[in-house]
Amino acid sequence: MQERFSAVLLVGAGGFAGASARYLIAVALSSFATGFPMATMLVNVLGCFLIGMISELSLTTSLLPSELRLLLATGFCGGFTTFSSYMYEISALLKDGELFYASLYLIGSLVGGMVFLYLGMALARVWS
């Protein structure tokens, strides 16, 4: 139980730092607003770089213990962007030769995300 609680604290601390970093980047780039979501794109691409580096280092070397991976990959990157997790999971499926599941996850998440975004918006309009 103690180990699980420690893991939750690590993920929470990393998530706080990641979400805060995302907000600060959005604030810093707000003066360059052009209608294009530059901050979101930057965060998503940077998050992919970070989760790729963190995961590779923790899986192939002893440089990052599992606790640090929880803090950085699950916590920080998870709070920073879930897009990085999405891309990493697709790459893991491809690495395992699961082209069908990788494609299903890629397309299903994009299409499903848009469909449910509009469903949520429609439901909110009904309530308002």
Curated annotation (Swiss-Prot):
It catalyses: fluoride(in) = fluoride(out). It comes from the Bacteria. The keyword Transmembrane helix applies. Coiled coil: none annotated. The chain crosses the membrane at residues 7-27, 34-54, 70-90, 104-124. InterPro entries: FluC. Na(+) binds at residues 78, 81. Belongs to the fluoride channel Fluc/FEX (TC 1.A.43) family. HAMAP family: FluC. This is Fluoride-specific ion channel FluC. The gene is fluC.
